[in-house]
Amino acid sequence: DDNVMINQAIVYFKNEEGRYKEAGNIKNAVPYLHQDPDSDEILGQCEESGRDQGHATLCVSLMGTFCQMAYNIGEDLFAYDNYRAVAMAEYVGKYNLIKDESFNKGTLVGDDFIYDSNSFPYTSYSNPSYTNATISTEQRGTKRPSWELFYGYCKEKGISSLYSEKWADQM
């Protein structure tokens, strides 16, 4: 009900206007875009992908929730900047996809994942606190109930979301 606060959050998301210059903006959350070598999709590297996959999948959950709240009031942040938030969900989703036969397995290892971490597109990322030279395998395969937001949006709009769809189907 606070239109000033809502507008401030949307402007901050799009333009990084505010106190915390290193966080909150979509281009900081998704600093690099990569062509998916297996499809026509664009994958958006999450700023947390080099830290660990627990944080990367949390970013997907939080970004999806924020974009859905904005969408509910008529502001389509899923589509903003050529679907940058969707590209992030697809990147994180693809990297963390677990083979069907391994999905309910406790401890996951490299062979349990569909895609090899050594050949996965990644650009070294730095912020004021740290530098991540490679994509992290820590907590890879973290399961969070967030994929339905992205998949549902993309299905409604007729947009491809291969990896969000696979996660939504597995959940």
Annotate each PLM feature:
Residues D52-Q68, V86-Y91:
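Well-ordered alpha-helical segments within folded domains of soluble proteins
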Residues D1, F66-A70, N96:
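Generic structural signal for hydrophobic core residues of well-folded globular domains
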